[in-house]
């Protein structure tokens, strides 16, 4: 999945890093200071929500866009409470991820239409 995300995004954005677990995400985000981070709720070592909490607590300015299989509005609320601006379901990645990132860059929220929120 990570390779598919990078392939989709590299035509539209500069990709400064990619990682496969939540701990590495926090470490690399602190080092690279990206404008936007695309993360999954279900990640190894730290979940995406735990990583978001750490980033938010450390004062990260990165805008967070969650890409996930979870469609529960409880997850959407929790992600937004941890500083997320985007919530994209993996089933809608090809159509929703780029608009979600663009909205996040403008400090606006985006939720895949398949999710009731």
Language model segments and positions:
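Short amphipathic alpha-helix used as the core "switch/output" element in two-component signaling
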Residues: 49-60
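Active-site beta3 strand of CheY-like receiver
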Residues: 32-38
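Receiver (REC) domain active-site loop signature in two-component systems and cognate sites
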Residues: 43
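Short, flexible helix-to-coil linker/hinge segments that flank and couple to helix-turn-helix
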Residues: 76-81, 86-117
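Short, conserved "switch-loop" micro-motifs in signal-transduction and mechanochemical regulators
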Residues: 70-71
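Two-component/phosphorelay signaling modules centered on CheY-like receiver
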Residues: 1-17
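Acidic catalytic/metal-coordinating carboxylates
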Residues: 21-24, 46-50
């Amino acid at each position: 999945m990570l390779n598919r995300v990078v392939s989709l995004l590299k035509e539209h954005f500069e990709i400064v890093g990619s990682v496969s677990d939540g701990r590495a995400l926090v470490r690399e985000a602190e080092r690279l200071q990206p404008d936007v981070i695309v993360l999954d709720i279900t990640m190894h070592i730290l979940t995406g929500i735990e990583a978001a909490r750490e980033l938010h607590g450390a004062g990260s300015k990165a805008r967070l866009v969650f890409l996930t299989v979870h469609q529960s509005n409880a997850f959407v609320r929790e992600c937004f409470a941890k500083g997320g601006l985007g919530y994209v379901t993996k089933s809608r990645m090809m159509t929703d991820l780029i608009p979600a990132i663009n909205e996040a860059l403008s400090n606006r929220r985006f939720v895949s239409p398949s999710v009731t929120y």
